[in-house]
Amino acid sequence: MTNNKFKSGFVAILGRPNVGKSTFMNHVMGQKIAIMSDKPQTTRNKIQGIYTTENEQIVFIDTPGIHKPHNALGDFMVQSAYSTLRECDVVLFMVAADEPRSTGENMIIERLKKAEVPVILVVNKIDKIHPDRLFEIVADYTSQMEFSEVVPISAKQGNNTERLIDTLSEKLDEGPQYFPEDQITDHPERFLVSEMIREKILLLTREEVPHSIAVTTDQMTRDEETGKIHIMATIIVERKSQKGIILGKGGDMIRKIGKMARRDIEIMLGDKVYLETWVKIKNDWRDRKMDLADFGYNRDDYM
């Protein structure tokens, strides 16, 4: 690209769990790169989505929802989210219009007051409220701190997201193109495969199971005869009872997880996939630093 006024920068998306951060980024990217579910703490790692046009490259960093951690994995997730404040050029503080400001938001606001970059308040899920309520919601948040801009959106419906992109572009300085124009994320395919499998477990299971699992993609090879991509993945659980839930009666659940995940993986890779999944028990892995690092949650990466 030869544009003397090409703009670029890194934009962190911060907020409590389930305010729509991943939904927004997937909408902007035009395809799924961050998994979504109705479970809190669905996003565990920082996910970078790369939005490129002729005039700009915006690298979005979708962070884990900020919450009060209850184990070492939770500590990792919160540390990962806050570490983006040291790396970004702009912060999007996303809140849900249909939920009142909570102690969680107040905690984030106190951190954001110390930020040395512009902070934009993004009021998401405006499709769920009456328009008359919007002024009241914005007034409540702006009474807590000064934001450089306020942009109401509906990430699910795409309302006002273009305006938010334009606002971000105005805040960014001229800069280089960090990634090739056809690259939409910095994560390797194996990570995305693991996340798509984990998403289906989040959708299909309940209670403690969704938060107690990790997924690793152990092997990805192409079968030269069939052209299919052979993927071997391991689902890690903390208890024998959880393994039984993941497997299901007669293997029904593990087959359902595999079928749903394979569909998304094939769309992402653009190839037919043979997916083989195994279930392994690792007692209390969420509180073991070595296990966390093995499964891709290394806290030292964000210190």
UniProtKB/Swiss-Prot annotation:
It holds the Pfam family MMR_HSR1. It is a peripheral membrane protein. The keyword Lipid biosynthesis does not apply. Residues 7-174 form the Era-type G domain. Its main location: cytoplasm. PANTHER family: GTPASE ERA (PTHR42698), GTPASE ERA, MITOCHONDRIAL (PTHR42698:SF1). This is GTPase Era.
